[in-house]
Amino acid sequence: GVPCRCDSDGPSVHGNTLSGTVWVGSCASGWHKCNDEYNIAYECCKE
């Protein structure tokens, strides 16, 4: 999947580890949204 930034990854600075995965729509079952950013198209999720 496409990596995305979770709040736990720290500020959005080039070189940071991106520990989330983009899910179109909303997170899959067993995953949780891992940041506060609101996007109607996708959520950044973590297992």
From Swiss-Prot:
The keyword GTP-binding does not apply. One of its GO terms (cellular component) is nematocyst. Disulfide bonds join 4-44, 6-34, 27-45. It is found in: Secreted; Nematocyst. GO terms for molecular function: sodium channel regulator activity; toxin activity. The modification Hydroxyproline is found at residue 3. Keywords: Disulfide bond, Hydroxylation, Ion channel impairing toxin, Nematocyst, Neurotoxin, Secreted, Toxin, Voltage-gated sodium channel impairing toxin. It comes from the Eukaryota. The keyword Translocase does not apply. SUPFAM superfamilies: Defensin-like (SSF57392). InterPro entries: Myo_ane_neurotoxin_sf. Its main location: secreted. Slows down the inactivation process of TTX-sensitive voltage-gated sodium channels (Nav). Has a strong crab-paralyzing activity. The minimum lethal dose against crabs is 7.9 mg/kg. Belongs to the sea anemone sodium channel inhibitory toxin family. Type I subfamily. This is Delta-actitoxin-Cgg1a.
